[in-house]
Amino acid sequence: MLSAIIGMGGGVTLLGIMAIIIPEGYLVVALHGVIQLVSNGTRVTVYRSHIHKNILKKFIAGLIPGLFLSAGLVFALIQYYNVSSAAELKIDFLKPLIGIYIIWFLYLRKKGKSVSDKAFLWMGGLSGLATVFIGAAGPLIAPFFINRKITKENVIATKAACQFFGHLGKLPIFIFMFDVNYLNQGTLLLPLFIAVYFGTKFGKMMLGKLPESTFRLLFKGALTLIAIRLMVVDIF
């Protein structure tokens, strides 16, 4: 519901909760990914008429090579550490860097014109890495929607579509390289899928009552809190 109202926050919050409950880092990322696939897919369906298609095309064009690079890196790590499965690797060490990047983008970078659509090409590539090695690529791409002349519905829809394809693309990596069997996790995933659907429907209703200025303030505030959480992830 949080993601449906302000475009983000729900995924990272869920990732943090799952990290507490599930000890295996790779399984947290894998299960979080399929839940977010449904969550973003639901938002894409609800807001499909608001998707900024040019941004999405650029993002996907960068995402595909990014995912292939992720698969190549995972394979290289398997060979280097001489393990039988990528499930034995620790892959969540980049989270603090994402937090630092967000703070820089929001508050420290030289302000100028809004980011062009072309920037989403290389951001798609970075997301192909982040979605596998970190789990939540939303905070990475979200700052690129700040100060753009698009509506709050455009932000919600386009960001959700970008993340949907990112989570979809990483499923084969976790199935074949991390030996994740999603069918065995059905009892855990099904209730969460149902909650995601109704949360999105309610979130859309609330978004319609939210002024654009308030939305952008909440969006930036949520990004800042998420950045701080990512930077201190190894402390708490």
PLM region descriptions:
Residues M1-I22, L108-K159:
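Selected transmembrane alpha-helices and immediately adjacent juxtamembrane segments
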Residues I20-L37, A86-I100, G125-G135, N184-A195:
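Structural signature of hydrophobic alpha-helical transmembrane segments
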Residues K53-I64, K95, S116-L126, I156-A161, ...:
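Cytoplasmic-side transmembrane-helix entry/capping segments in multi-pass membrane proteins
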